[in-house]
């Protein structure tokens, strides 16, 4: 995958982005990720069945275009990805959309769940997620 389709170039420019090399021959300049083959494009409301779990696809754009979350209503789990996490929510990356991010925060205030697995940091509960969303909406508004 070409760097222009990722943010890899930003991480290569930050020596602290990788704490230590996985082996002596590893080089961040030569590192490449091979994309998994596309099986299908997911859309709002689609279901993903894993055998023992079912996830509803929820469109959560703003941080990055096309971001999704996965909601397991039976277990109360929300896989939120980079849509929300502790700390300053980033809405100024290439491809970010602050207006769409505000709509995502509004949406997250309405979703019922027990715990959210975020793309960064620890698992959070619904109360903390809603506090983060409200803080973003208050500061961005």
Regions found by a protein language model. Name each.
Residues 5-8, 75-76, 93-95, 130-133:
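Short, glycine/charged-enriched secondary-structure capping and boundary segments
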Residues 23-26, 84-87, 132-140:
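Short glycine/proline- and charge-enriched loop/turn segments
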